[in-house]
From Swiss-Prot:
GO MF annotation: an example: glutamyl-tRNA reductase activity
Recorded family membership: Belongs to the glutamyl-tRNA reductase family.
Protein name: Glutamyl-tRNA reductase
Note: During catalysis, the active site Cys acts as a nucleophile attacking the alpha-carbonyl group of tRNA-bound glutamate with the formation of a thioester intermediate between enzyme and glutamate, and the concomitant release of tRNA(Glu). The thioester intermediate is finally reduced by direct hydride transfer from NADPH, to form the product GSA.
Binding site for substrate: 49-52, 109, 114-116, 120
Comment, domains: Possesses an unusual extended V-shaped dimeric structure with each monomer consisting of three distinct domains arranged along a curved 'spinal' alpha-helix. The N-terminal catalytic domain specifically recognizes the glutamate moiety of the substrate. The second domain is the NADPH-binding domain, and the third C-terminal domain is responsible for dimerization.
EC number annotated for this UniProt entry: 1.2.1.70
The keyword NADP appears for this protein: yes
Annotated site (Important for activity): 99
Pathway(s): Porphyrin-containing compound metabolism; protoporphyrin-IX biosynthesis; 5-aminolevulinate from L-glutamyl-tRNA(Glu): step 1/2
Keywords noted in UniProt: NADP, Oxidoreductase, Porphyrin biosynthesis
Catalytic activity: (S)-4-amino-5-oxopentanoate + tRNA(Glu) + NADP(+) = L-glutamyl-tRNA(Glu) + NADPH + H(+)
GO biological process: protoporphyrinogen IX biosynthetic process from glutamate
Amino acid sequence: MFPITIGLNHKTAPVEIREKVSFHPSEINKALMELNELSALNGIVLLSTCNRLEIYAATPEVELGVSVIKKFLARHGKLREEDINQYLYVHTLYDSVRHLFRVVAGLDSMVMGETQILGQVAEAYEKSSQLNLSNKIIHAIFQNALAVGKRVRSETQIDQHPTSVSYTAVELAKQTFGDVQGKSILILGAGEMSALTAKHLVASGADTVLVSNRSMQRAQALAEEFSGRAIPYEELDTALAEADIVISATAAAHFVIKPERMRRVMEQRRQRALLLIDIAVPRDIHPNVGELEGVTLFDIDDLRGVVDSHQKAREEAALQAGRILEEEMGRFVKWHNSLYVVPTIVALQRRGEEVREIMLKSALNKLGPIDEKQEKIIRSMANSIVTHLLHAPIANLKEAANTSQGHLYTEILQNLFDLDGNELSPHAGWSVHHAASHHSNQG
C-alpha cells in the first residue's frame, strides 16, 4: 500500500474554487464512506478546513488511486476534471508523509504556525478511525504526524505568536480602525472559529461583542462566555445596523448577507462606515456587498495581505520546526524501511534453513549409517556454511536500510534469492522506481 495526498489550499486555489469543493461537517462521514467504496483506496482521511481540502489515502496503485480521488472531487464540486486539476496538488509516498508533517506543524498554513490545524487534523483522523476506515500505514503516518505537531509546538515558539486566522481577522479590524475599543462588534456564527475570534477581540479590549447564530442557545452560550450579548437571528438586520465591525464565520452553505439586504442596512446606518470580514468557507457574504458605499469587505483570501509584526520571530521558529520535521522524517523512513528489511531478512534466513535441511537430508541418505558424533559434525558444518554465507548480505542490508537506496538493495536481494513476496510486510515497496512513478506537485 502506498500513501497519497490529493488536495488544494489557499496557495493553489482561490476561495471561489475552495468553497465549491469544501465539505460541510455534516457531509464528511458520507464522503468518507463514498471514498471507501472505491476499490482503489484504503485507509482514508478527509481534511476540510477554511483554507484547505485534502484527502489522504493508501492505495495499491498510485496512478489509479490519484485518478479516482480527482474524479471524486470534480463530481463533488460540480466541476469538470480539467477545470479542477489545475488547482490540485498531488503528493505520493514519502512526499505525502512529509506534506502532512508540514501541515500539522503549521508550516503550510496561510498564517504560519497557526494553532488550530493540529486539532483539525486530529479530528479528521478520529472521524476516519470511528468509521473503521484507517489502516495500519495511515494510522502510523497520522500518529507520527500528530506527534510532530506537538513536538514543534513544545520545542519552538511557532505558536507563541498570534497566528490563527481568527486573530488575523481581529488584527485587520484594528489596522482599519486603529483600535477596537469602543467599537460595536458583531460575530456571525457560534462555532470554534467564532469563539476564537471573540477571544482575540476581548483580549484586544473590545467592550461590546454581539453574537448572532441560527441557534439562539449557542449564541447565548458564546456571548455569555465573553460577557457579550446574543442577538436573535431574526434581528440580524438590526444588529448589522448597530455594528461597526462584522466578523462572519458561520457554517452556512449559502450567502448569509447579500447586496439587497446590505443596501437596506446601509440606508438605516446613513452610510456610516462598516467593516465586514468574511472568514467562512463557503463565504457568508456576497462579494458584491463590498461595492456598496461605506462598506469595506475582506474575505479569507484578503487576510494574506495583513502585515504580521511577528514575521521575523515566526520565520526563525519555522526554521527550527523544519529541522524537527526533517529529523522526524528520518525516523519515520528508518521505521518504514524496517518494515521491509526485517521481513526480508527473516525470509532469507528461512530460505537458508530450507536449503540446509534439503541438502543435509540428501547427504545423510547418501552416506548411509553413521554414528551420532559424525552426524552432529555434519549438521554443525551445514549450519556454519549457511550462517557465514548469509552474514554479509544480511549485514549489508541492515546498513543500507537507513539510506535512500535501502529499498533497492532489499528488492535486489529478494530477486537474487527468489524470496516469497507473501512473507514480506504488507507496507513494503515504496521503492525508488515507485517514487518516480507519479509526479508530485507542490502545494
